[in-house]
Design a protein with these regions (language model features):
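Mid-domain Rossmann-like dinucleotide-binding core that forms the NAD(H)/NADP(H) cofactor-binding site
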Residues: 42, 84-158
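Short amphipathic alpha-helix with an adjacent loop that forms part of the alpha/beta core around
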Residues: 160-171
Length: 286
């Protein structure tokens, strides 16, 4: 949301609408329904995805009107605060980890395991039976990834990162990489990925035009999947929603909230996110 507002998306030079209410994610109660939607949905506690995707008015408001499938029932016991983080971060994490099928017994490396998406991805992978490895930076970051379920944690800036990872696995490669910085890490990824492994990349902010080691990846038949939750197919989204619901029902996800501000402090919330100095999501409340 901050990057979209600030014009930080590659190729996007101007806002698509003259007036915009920002934000894609949120949670709340359905107060009214349109034609064709069962009236029984009124009063349902829901979380929202793609609130401001290709439309002018997003979730930084008291009300939003959306297609019924974009309002997903919150599992019993899941708070609105947790639900507000499920849209982009939750769907990204669960699809990046489980979009290729079960990971039980597999080795999954999560890049940036202390970030909002990364820490959720660590939890998803661990709860799904994977051996989880994660990179982070600093004592707090490494502890955050480890507390989420990573069996092995590494400083992502280490010069010998690939060697450290392979030492931790006894020389065995990793089957799946959930990648927040594709360009920065692709050389390391090519060294540690298994044959027919997958790199599920949802970011490359530090290198937006990466040079890819094509042959090392090709001769392992590596799949590179670029994850953009806005464009998941209907089947992929239903699967991701189902996986999220199952994990929430098991209380397997710990959503970190850094700060909750009133809606009137929306600009301040953007400033907090832009500084990067936070440990969790920043929410707006009404």
């Amino acid at each position: 949301d901050v990057r979209a507002r600030a014009g930080g998306r590659p190729g996007v030079t101007a806002p698509p609408f003259a007036k915009i209410i920002p934000h894609s994610d949120g949670a709340g109660v359905i107060e009214a329904v349109g034609a064709g939607v069962p009236s029984g949905r009124i009063g349902a506690r829901v979380w929202i995805w793609n609130g401001q995707w290709q439309r002018a008015f997003g979730t930084a408001a008291q009300y939003i009107a959306l297609p019924t499938e974009q309002a997903v029932d919150l599992p019993e016991g899941t708070s609105f605060e947790e639900g507000a983080v499920l849209g982009i971060p939750g769907l990204t994490a669960v699809h990046a980890v489980l979009g290729g099928g079960p990971v039980e017994g597999r080795r999954v490396l999560v890049s940036g395991g202390a970030g909002t998406v990364g820490r959720l991805a660590v939890q998803v992978a661990a709860a799904s039976g994977a051996e989880v490895l994660a990179t982070a930076r600093g004592v707090a970051g490494l502890q955050a990834a480890q507390s989420a379920g990573a069996a092995h944690v590494f400083d992502y800036a280490a010069d010998d990162l690939a060697e450290q990872i392979l030492a931790a696995t006894g020389g065995a490669p990793v089957d799946r990489i959930v990648e927040v910085e594709f360009g920065r890490n692709v050389e390391t990824s090519a060294r540690i990925i298994a044959e027919r492994g997958t790199i599920a990349a949802f970011g490359s902010a530090q290198d937006m035009t990466p040079v890819v080691p094509f042959y090392p990846l090709m001769f392992k038949a590596v799949t590179i999947e670029l994850v953009l939750v806005y464009l998941l197919s209907d089947a992929e989204r239903r699967a991701a929603e189902g996986n999220l619901t199952g994990l929430l029902d098991k209380r397997a996800l710990d959503v970190r909230i850094a700060e909750i501000l009133p809606l009137t402090d929306c600009a301040r919330a953007h400033d907090i996110v832009a500084t990067g100095a936070r440990a969790g999501s920043v929410l707006l409340s009404i």
